[in-house]
């Protein structure tokens, strides 16, 4: 009887350990899948400048420039630029932050006749965007590590022919994600945005700019633009994640 109890306890312990290990393995794989999906999502949206041309015309950014442009004494007459010029400038910023900050100092804005008016960015703005470029460089390195880990786990899971968690388990995971998003909304997206800046960027480096003093903030209507971008990246990443998991399930079913 004693031996049976000991064997049962050992068997239960092995089962619990195995179940816990599989659960942790799936959590890690799903997190890596999301990181890979976010990386792909960023790369895709960057190709179209994060929909800035559409947002400029439909999200109040053109009106923001028309109102605050005449009030900016540091970089005047930005309201005289055309929509195409603003798109060119935003594209230049997107390219620069993805290329180690190269070209930020030389960006110039022109009026409707093509006459140069002034350089776009002040020194504090250049420093901030250089910080953004440095951050992106680190995130790219992290994304490569995540991709490598994801591929290794994918191969391992395929070799062991492990099926995906049940829809109920995935739903619980999505519910957890929804709770996090809900907390962000309750606490205030703007407050969270500002707090992240304090954590991420070097102390003493300016990252908050008033519209009347910054063409960068004015043309982006910060932080509104970043909220739109966050939604686009998240939704696209979720769709890509679902596609990757569906592909995994298809590969497992054919083995």
Task: Give a label for each model feature.
Residues 2-52:
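Hydrophobic secretory-pathway targeting helix
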Residues 16, 20, 146-193, 242-255:
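Juxtamembrane interface at the cytosolic side of transmembrane helices
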Residues 38, 43-90:
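Juxtamembrane non-transmembrane segments of integral membrane proteins
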Residues 50-57, 135-162:
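Membrane-proximal low-complexity regions enriched in glycine and acidic/polar residues
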Residues 77-89, 114-124, 169-187:
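Hydrophobic alpha-helical transmembrane segments
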Residues 91-145, 222-233:
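Individual transmembrane alpha-helix segments
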Residues 187-211:
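Juxtamembrane non-transmembrane "cap" segments at the membrane-aqueous interface
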Residues 204-255:
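Terminal transmembrane helical module of multi-pass membrane proteins
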């Amino acid at each position: 009887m004693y031996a049976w109890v000991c064997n049962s306890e050992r068997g239960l312990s092995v089962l619990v350990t195995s179940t816990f290990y599989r659960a942790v393995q799936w959590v890690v794989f799903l997190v890596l899948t999301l990181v890979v999906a976010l990386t792909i999502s960023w790369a895709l949206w960057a190709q179209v400048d994060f929909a800035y041309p559409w947002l400029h015309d439909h999200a109040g950014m053109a009106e923001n420039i028309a109102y605050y442009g005449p009030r900016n004494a540091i970089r005047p007459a930005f309201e005289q630029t055309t929509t195409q010029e603003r798109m060119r400038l935003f594209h230049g910023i997107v390219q620069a932050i993805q290329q180690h900050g190269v070209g930020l100092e030389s960006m110039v804005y022109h009026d409707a006749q093509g006459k140069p008016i002034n350089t776009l960015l002040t020194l504090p703005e250049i420093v901030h965007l250089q910080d953004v470029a440095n951050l992106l460089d680190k995130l790219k390195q992290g994304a490569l590590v995540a991709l490598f880990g994801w591929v290794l786990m994918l191969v391992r899971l395929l070799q062991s022919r492990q099926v995906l968690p049940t829809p109920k388990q995935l739903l619980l995971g999505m519910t957890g994600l929804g709770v996090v998003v809900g907390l962000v909304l309750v606490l205030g997206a703007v407050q969270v945005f500002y707090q992240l800046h304090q954590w991420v960027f070097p102390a003493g480096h300016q990252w908050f700019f008033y519209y009347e003093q910054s063409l960068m903030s004015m043309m982006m209507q910060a932080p509104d633009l970043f909220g739109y971008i966050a939604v686009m990246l998240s939704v696209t990443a979720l769709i890509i994640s679902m596609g990757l998991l569906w592909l995994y399930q298809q590969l497992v079913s054919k083995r």
